[in-house]
């Protein structure tokens, strides 16, 4: 049973929501208010535990989650007040070699939003040294690290001490038809010209370390470990072994749309 501290009525957790393993049991409480103290009691028949008090975390919004802050440095657009302070990263740095912008602000915001802007992501066929290469519009928590030839190395992740149960926001997706298909396709997937393109949103919480997830084996000069405590995961687009894996043992929670 549980109740908000200072109230008199207890709320009983339904039996089907209690998982029992031997002499231990656990449950997950939902719908609690942030920054609020609750009293908890465990019981079996007439036996009751002492009252335990817990306080829920603050409901933290992601920095620049409304995508109101943008800057331009060295002709590259970043979703932040400055490049170095940006919580979010994009592939704009790599696409700039071909003179393209994949992610930028737009005034086409969600009706009812208090801000001025939203983020606009667009996939484009970028021409680099006479070679056409599809660059997907993207936006991720982390930062763009370095370009190697026509490939990019990006850093995923930022420290986050809260224990979220969901990521909420608004998205509008205009689906186009695929016009160009490369020679390399994802395992188990067949893509043809004319197929509808797919957009994807995913969020993960984990315990990644730069020592394990921030090493780029294909780096031939300098330190191979490009990950840091601030941005621990390195994804080298030359190396499929570095691609994000939602089944990694470091992943605590994962969801996608």
Predicted regions located by residue number:
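Extracellular low-complexity, O-glycosylation-prone stalks/linkers
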Residues: 1-15
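Aromatic (Trp/Tyr/Phe) and Gly/Pro-enriched flexible surface segments
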Residues: 50-164, 194-206, 213-257
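Solvent-exposed serine/threonine-rich low-complexity stretches and specific carbohydrate-binding patches
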Residues: 11-22, 255-257
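Extracellular recognition modules
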Residues: 39-43
């Amino acid at each position: 049973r549980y109740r908000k501290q200072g109230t008199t009525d207890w709320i009983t957790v339904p039996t089907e929501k209690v998982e029992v393993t031997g002499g231990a049991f656990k449950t997950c409480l939902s719908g609690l208010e942030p920054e609020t103290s609750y009293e908890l009691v465990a019981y079996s028949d007439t036996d009751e535990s002492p009252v335990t008090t817990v306080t829920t975390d603050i409901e933290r919004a992601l920095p620049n989650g409304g995508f109101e802050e943008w800057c331009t440095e060295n002709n590259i657009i970043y979703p932040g007040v400055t490049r170095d302070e940006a919580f979010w990263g994009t592939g704009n740095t790599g696409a700039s070699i071909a003179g393209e912008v994949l992610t930028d602000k737009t005034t086409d915001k969600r009706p009812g939003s208090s801000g001025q802007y939203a983020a606009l992501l667009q996939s484009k066929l970028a021409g680099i040294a006479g070679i056409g290469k599809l660059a997907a519009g993207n936006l991720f928590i982390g930062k763009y690290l370095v370009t190697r030839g026509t490939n990019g190395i990006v850093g995923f992740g930022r420290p986050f001490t809260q224990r979220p149960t969901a990521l909420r926001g608004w998205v509008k997706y205009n689906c186009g038809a695929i016009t160009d298909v490369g020679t390399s396709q994802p395992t188990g997937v067949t893509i043809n010209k004319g197929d509808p393109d797919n957009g994807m949103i995913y969020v993960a919480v984990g315990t990644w370390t730069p020592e394990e997830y921030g090493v780029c084996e294909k780096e031939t000069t300098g330190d191979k470990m490009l990950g840091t405590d601030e941005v621990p995961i390195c994804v080298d687009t030359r190396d499929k072994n570095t691609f994000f894996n939602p089944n990694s043992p470091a992943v605590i929670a994962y969801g996608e749309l």
